[in-house]
């Protein structure tokens, strides 16, 4: 017979033992009862001590009887203290066992649920599924790359030639901007001689005037 069976009077192989919750509650009730007994004995010890002091000098026989009763109460109190310690230890152990039982029960329930969830799963099928997902992702990436590439629609150009032409245009634009910043180029004019041009000879001019006058006279007399 188990200790719990001996304590609570359950016996026989066919007898059903108390549940952990019932046993824990009974132990708590026992602790409460013993605590009240402790309080009662402590009061009795105080009373007997008062009685012994009261008859200490007047009635030694009554004082001795009071001290004997006090000793018996103290012995009972010590026994109850030990019993309470044992019951408290047993209750804590039973509570821990009950907690462990509940934890294991819940873990077992979770394990069964996990097993049921995995019953229709095959690791090979999972691997195949993950491989299919990876293949589809790779295909999707290839399609995205193909779509993002520019299409020439039959136009085939030399990239190097186009780049060279672009650089030439850029250089022309830079030169043009540079000229606009510096202003129009100043064209140097020919040097002007410092000395004055030689004047026409006065004599030659007079001769020309005389010739003109003679021609005029000849025309008038003709």
From Swiss-Prot:
Source organism per UniProt: Xenopus laevis (African clawed frog)
Source taxon at top rank: Eukaryota
GO BP annotations, alphabetical order: exit from mitosis; late endosome to vacuole transport via multivesicular body sorting pathway; membrane fission; mitotic cytokinesis; nuclear membrane reassembly; protein transport; vesicle budding from membrane
Membrane-related topology note: Peripheral membrane protein
Coiled coil: 21-182
Role played: Probable core component of the endosomal sorting required for transport complex III (ESCRT-III) which is involved in multivesicular bodies (MVBs) formation and sorting of endosomal cargo proteins into MVBs. MVBs contain intraluminal vesicles (ILVs) that are generated by invagination and scission from the limiting membrane of the endosome and mostly are delivered to lysosomes enabling degradation of membrane proteins, such as stimulated growth factor receptors, lysosomal enzymes and lipids.
GO CC terms: cytoplasmic side of plasma membrane; cytosol; ESCRT III complex; late endosome membrane; midbody; multivesicular body; nuclear envelope
Localization in the cell: Cytoplasm, Cytosol; Late endosome membrane; Midbody
Main location: cytoplasm
Taxonomic path: Eukaryota, Metazoa, Chordata, Craniata, Vertebrata
Subunit structure and binding partners: Probable core component of the endosomal sorting required for transport complex III (ESCRT-III). ESCRT-III components are thought to multimerize to form a flat lattice on the perimeter membrane of the endosome.
Pfam families, alphabetized: Snf7
Protein name: Charged multivesicular body protein 4b
Region (Disordered): 1-21, 177-222
InterPro entries: Snf7_fam
Family assignment from sequence similarity: Belongs to the SNF7 family.
Keywords associated with the record: Coiled coil, Cytoplasm, Endosome, Membrane, Protein transport, Transport
């Amino acid at each position: 017979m188990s200790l719990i069976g001996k304590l609570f009077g359950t016996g026989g192989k066919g007898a059903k033992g108390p549940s952990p919750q019932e046993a824990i509650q009974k132990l708590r009730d026992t602790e409460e009862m013993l605590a009240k007994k402790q309080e009662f004995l402590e009061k009795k010890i105080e009373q007997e001590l008062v009685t012994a002091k009261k008859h200490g000098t007047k009635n030694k026989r009554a004082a001795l009887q009071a001290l004997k009763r006090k000793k018996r109460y103290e012995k009972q109190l010590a026994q109850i203290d030990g019993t309470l310690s044992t019951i408290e230890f047993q209750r804590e152990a039973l509570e821990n066992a009950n907690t462990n039982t509940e934890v294991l029960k819940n873990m077992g329930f979770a394990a069964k649920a996990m097993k049921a969830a995995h019953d229709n799963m095959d690791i090979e099928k999972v691997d195949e599924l993950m491989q299919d997902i990876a293949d589809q992702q790779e295909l999707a990436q290839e399609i995205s790359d193909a779509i993002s590439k520019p299409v020439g629609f039959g136009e085939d150009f030399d990239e190097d030639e186009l780049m060279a032409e672009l650089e030439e245009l850029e250089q022309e634009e830079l030169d043009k901007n540079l000229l606009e910043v510096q202003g129009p180029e100043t064209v140097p004019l020919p040097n002007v001689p410092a000395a004055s041009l030689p004047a026409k000879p006065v004599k030659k001019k007079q001769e020309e005037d005389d010739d003109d006058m003679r021609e005029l006279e000849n025309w008038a007399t003709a």
